[in-house]
Amino acid sequence: MKETIRIIGIDPGLRRTGWGIVESLGNSLHFIGSGTVTSNAEMDLASRLCQLHEGLSKVLHEFMPHEAAVEHTFVNKDATATLKLGQARGIALLAPAQAGLPVTEYAPNAVKKAVIGVGHGEKQQIHMMVKVLMPRASFDTSDAADALAIAICHAHHRQSIVSARRMQALLAG
């Protein structure tokens, strides 16, 4: 018998971290919620990371997802910005792990391919397909829409991931 799995997708960012929650039952997806957690740019880095952690922890506590998916970050020419984004990504991995959730990471191209069918696409295409796949989905920011796309990607890939984890457990035990 299939079970409903609640998934949180997280799109890390230091200014805004998007989150999106979907429920997956077999091949059907249902929108649960989405939003952003923000940090105050006037504050020091440690305080901003704390704000992101507290905000994500509240979302996790409120919606009680079963699994989490986080997008890999890309490296750009600005090393300082890349490092700060990496630290925000660390928070995006830490918060669900602290809540006891299995966390899976996806490359941006994998997310695009899962949602629009190709690994290279525009944000508008992704946002449109999120609405096609889940007509009741609502999102106020691009970050929240991207987070929903990450959750959708995980819903599409999770069965093979679950099977691989079971196989590893059997081989280890």
From Swiss-Prot:
The active site is at 11, 71, 143. Its main location: cytoplasm. GO terms for molecular function: crossover junction DNA endonuclease activity; DNA binding; magnesium ion binding. Its EC number is 3.1.21.10. The keyword Metal-binding applies. GO terms for cellular component: cytoplasm; Holliday junction resolvase complex. Mg(2+) 1 binds at residues 11, 143. Keywords: Cytoplasm, DNA damage, DNA recombination, DNA repair, DNA-binding, Endonuclease, Hydrolase, Magnesium, Metal-binding, Nuclease. Mg(2+) 2 binds at residue 71. PROSITE patterns: RUVC. The keyword Acyltransferase does not apply. Its cofactor is Mg(2+). It catalyses: Endonucleolytic cleavage at a junction such as a reciprocal single-stranded crossover between two homologous DNA duplexes (Holliday junction). It is an enzyme of class 3 (hydrolase). InterPro entries: RNaseH-like_sf, RNaseH_sf, X-over_junc_endoDNase_Mg_BS, X-over_junc_endoDNase_RuvC. Binds 2 Mg(2+) ion per subunit. It is found in: Cytoplasm. GO terms for biological process: DNA recombination; DNA repair. The RuvA-RuvB-RuvC complex processes Holliday junction (HJ) DNA during genetic recombination and DNA repair. Endonuclease that resolves HJ intermediates. Cleaves cruciform DNA by making single-stranded nicks across the HJ at symmetrical positions within the homologous arms, yielding a 5'-phosphate and a 3'-hydroxyl group; requires a central core of homology in the junction. The consensus cleavage sequence is 5'-(A/T)TT(C/G)-3'. Cleavage occurs on the 3'-side of the TT dinucleotide at the point of strand exchange. Homodimer which binds Holliday junction (HJ) DNA. The HJ becomes 2-fold symmetrical on binding to RuvC with unstacked arms; it has a different conformation from HJ DNA in complex with RuvA. In the full resolvosome a probable DNA-RuvA(4)-RuvB(12)-RuvC(2) complex forms which resolves the HJ. Belongs to the RuvC family. This is Crossover junction endodeoxyribonuclease RuvC. The lineage of its organism: Bacteria, Pseudomonadati, Pseudomonadota, Alphaproteobacteria, Hyphomicrobiales. The gene is ruvC.
